[in-house]
Amino acid sequence: MRKFIGLNGNTIALQNKFYNSSGNVPFWAMPKLLNQTGNSFMFRGLPDGRYRDKGAFAFQGEYRHSFKNRFGFVIFTSTGSVFSSWNDIDFSEFKNAYGFGLRYQLRKESSENLRLDIGFSPNEPMGIYILFKEAF
């Protein structure tokens, strides 16, 4: 689910995702805390697939600020966890990531941006991402 809130010409963007599986799920098909290229992008700063189990929940938020000269910046944060069953969800085990990014609007008549994001997560290597379009 996504929600976008206008704030004096800027945007607060919110997103949450929930995945659940049952039965004998192969490791490669298990839900994970996401770090995917393309338009779906959560947990920038956390290595892809590091945390997997039968269920996953993730939330992220961004503050997007645009300048009049086609440049802008974002600050973002993510939190979430994986779990084997509903009874195993432990909020003290949630993983967190955060960071900032720069934006360049490719054409004035389009909302497509070139973006550079730098993400951090405790005890993980810094992530650097150069992509087109917003994370979500």
Where does each model-flagged region fall?
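Membrane-embedded beta-strands of outer-membrane beta-barrel proteins
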Residues: 1, 14, 59-61, 100-102, ...
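Transmembrane beta-strand segments that form the barrel wall of outer-membrane beta-barrel proteins
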Residues: 11-16, 43-49, 73-81, 85, ...
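Residues that define the transmembrane beta-barrel architecture of outer-membrane proteins
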Residues: 10, 53-57, 92-98, 124-128
